[in-house]
């Protein structure tokens, strides 16, 4: 059965292993193909910018970052290598976060976070000591939280000294996080709970029961949280979408998908009025809706939709198509009405976005 997307995270590890085995056979017979070349000179000072992290292939140390100028439609592949020719980014670049005047590149299978200058993408330093980091969230000017696949804890990073200073015990695969005043809400794929951390004490103060394989979380204009869980067929746990009050931690609404659905990759538009998620196709749902959408917003034309993000600056949707997980991803850029604006190539398994 063709899964909606490898972003159904538990399948991502299996696919990595399958693709890695294929690559060992494939590359033993043919020479490596080079990355897609730049279509122009790097203009890091562009008015609008989109950075795309490309995971690469698991165990092949070939992750990269693509740069896209939405005004000129210029694409620069592997901007990290272009600006740092003697440094390898690492294995599986999972996500990107801007903190101050630096970008933090979370390199999952290299157990590190690589810091580059936002001015020129030049390497600054790395933070090491992680087990398998996923995302970094700045919670104050001097402190950040890092989720992790295997560590069973959240790493607390000093953003001034750029090192791990403590940990917050949290069982399971911690994934995306969102801050609401002095609370951080942490999704967890292996547990059925959304964990609540007090930023002042760096301690878990509550847990909210949600569906299995929860990974998507957004905050709407009414200051309600939305959490998307992909479910688990082996334990008959259906996918669910929860609306949660972040003040009281009460679940306000629960929307349940069918056993055939595998929704993932929850995002919200610039007005924070409409939700979008991948479920083979791309669906749109108003935050005031009383039921799940039945008609897709953007149809999959035999695409392998892998990841997406809303560009809040230009009010546009960017969607990654991972193709066969071996060749370079295709990025589709849509306006808020779902009309295609531009299609371009990024690196292998494009999954993370930063827009400004």
Labelled PLM ranges:
Residues 25-28:
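C-terminal motif of bacterial Sec signal peptides marking the signal peptidase cleavage site
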Residues 30-356:
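Predominantly soluble domains enriched in secretory-pathway, periplasmic, or organellar proteins
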């Amino acid at each position: 059965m063709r899964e909606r997307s490898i972003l159904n995270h538990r399948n991502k590890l299996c696919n990595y292993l399958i693709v890695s085995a294929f690559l060992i056979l494939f590359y033993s017979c043919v020479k490596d193909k080079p990355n897609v070349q730049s279509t122009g000179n790097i203009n890091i000072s562009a008015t609008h910018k989109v950075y795309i992290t490309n995971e690469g292939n698991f165990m092949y140390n070939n992750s990269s970052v693509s740069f896209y100028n939405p005004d000129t439609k210029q694409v620069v592949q592997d901007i990290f290598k272009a600006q740092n020719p003697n440094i390898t980014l690492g294995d599986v670049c999972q996500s990107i976060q801007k903190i101050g005047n630096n970008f933090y590149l979370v390199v999952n299978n290299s157990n590190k976070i690589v810091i580059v200058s936002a001015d020129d993408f030049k390497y600054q330093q790395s933070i090491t000591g992680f087990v398998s980091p996923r995302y970094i969230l700045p919670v104050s000017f001097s402190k950040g939280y890092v989720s992790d696949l295997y560590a069973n804890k959240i790493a607390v990073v000093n953003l001034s000294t750029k090192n791990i200073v403590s940990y917050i015990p949290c069982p399971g695969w911690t994934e995306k996080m969102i801050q609401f005043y002095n609370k951080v809400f942490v999704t967890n794929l292996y547990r059925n709970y959304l964990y609540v951390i007090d930023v002042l004490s760096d301690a878990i103060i509550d847990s909210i029961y949600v569906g299995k394989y929860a990974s998507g979380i957004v905050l709407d204009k009414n200051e309600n949280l939305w959490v998307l869980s992909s479910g688990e067929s082996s334990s008959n746990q259906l996918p669910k979408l929860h609306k949660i009050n972040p003040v009281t931690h009460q679940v306000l609404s629960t929307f349940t998908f069918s056993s055939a659905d595998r929704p993932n990759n929850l995002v919200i538009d610039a007005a924070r009025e409409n939700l979008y998620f991948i479920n083979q196709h791309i669906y749109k749902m108003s935050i005031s809706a009383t039921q799940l959408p039945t008609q897709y917003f953007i149809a999959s034309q035999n695409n392998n939709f892998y990841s997406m993000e809303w560009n809040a600056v230009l009010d546009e949707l960017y969607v990654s198509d991972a193709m066969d997980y071996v060749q370079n991803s295709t990025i589709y850029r849509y306006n808020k009405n779902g009309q295609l604006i531009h299609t371009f190539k990024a690196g292998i398994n494009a999954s993370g976005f930063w827009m400004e």
